[in-house]
């Protein structure tokens, strides 16, 4: 592949997200420099094999659209109705709260331009890490985090979107708090902040619905997993054991023509984050690590 010179260890991003299309892997993420604050947008890296990557190409310039006030976080690119939609978190100029915006492009390489009418998370909430979910009836939803910075015990929520993904069209539903899972650290301090990060939805080969998300367990960043017991987004779910509990998280899963992968960033130390790729297996009623890493 022309101009392929980077290995994963050379790529310093948080919150990796991969879109696989036509034999190529498109990698997006938060520019880790300054923890993604005022970094001016997002890049895309391209690979044929998950090992050798192109130099980054800017795919969204947040300065151009006056969206570089602070946070430029967690870009995800979803193909929907023939176009490419980027869900990403920015700090708003108006109220200085973070929220998820939707951007649009005709190509996975960008350039992306603003698409949504504003945030597609609640206006007065501080939110991050919105992801797109399409239910069995083809209706779009956003799944996102209500931040611990505003409510102490962070939550994961969802809400319906308009068919064109330009606005939120219903009241949010809270799924759970960071302190809810059976394995969560049970603090003696009620005002201790608890983090929720990075939801991502996946439907298995047997039509089971899962959600990846991240938090901290015993002080280390962790990749967690929820199973929706009736196969649809709602309040009937089970917290499964964490997939990774040793300083790695904000992951997502993707398939190529042969294999199934989890990507996440690790370590969680600013300046040292890199995308990692682990082969996983869809066994229908669960997602399991195969313990091999690209």
Q: Residue ranges of each PLM-predicted region?
A:
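Carbohydrate-active catalytic/glycan-binding domains of CAZyme proteins
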Residues: 1-294
């Amino acid at each position: 592949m022309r101009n392929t010179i980077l290995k994963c260890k050379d790529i310093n991003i948080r919150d990796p997200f991969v879109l696989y299309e036509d034999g190529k892997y498109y990698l997006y993420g938060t520019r880790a420099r300054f923890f993604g604050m005022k970094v001016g947008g997002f890049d895309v890296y391209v690979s044929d094999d998950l090992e050798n990557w192109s130099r980054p190409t800017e795919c969204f310039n947040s300065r151009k659209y006056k969206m570089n006030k602070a946070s430029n976080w967690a870009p995800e690119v979803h193909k929907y109705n023939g176009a490419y939609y980027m869900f990403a978190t920015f700090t708003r100029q108006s109220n200085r709260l973070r929220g998820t915006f939707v951007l649009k492009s005709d190509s996975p390489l960008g350039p992306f331009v603003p698409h949504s009418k504003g945030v597609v998370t609640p206006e007065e909430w501080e939110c991050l890490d919105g992801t797109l979910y399409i239910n069995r009836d083809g209706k779009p939803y956003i799944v996102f985090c209500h931040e611990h910075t505003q409510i102490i015990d962070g939550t994961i929520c969802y809400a319906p979107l308009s068919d064109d993904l330009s606005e939120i069209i219903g009241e949010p539903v809270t799924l759970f708090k960071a302190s809810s899972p059976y394995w969560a650290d049970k603090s003696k301090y009620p005002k201790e902040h608890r983090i929720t990060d990075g939801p991502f939805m996946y439907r298995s080969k047997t039509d089971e619905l899962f959600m990846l998300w991240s938090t901290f367990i015993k002080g280390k960043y962790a990749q967690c997993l929820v199973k929706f017991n009736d196969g649809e987004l709602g309040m009937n779910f089970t917290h499964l054991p964490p997939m990774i509990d040793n300083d790695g998280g904000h992951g997502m899963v993707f398939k190529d023509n042969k294999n199934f992968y989890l990507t996440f960033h690790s370590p969680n130390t600013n300046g040292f984050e890199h995308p990692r790729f682990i082969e996983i297996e869809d066994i229908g009623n669960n997602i399991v690590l195969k313990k091999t890493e690209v």
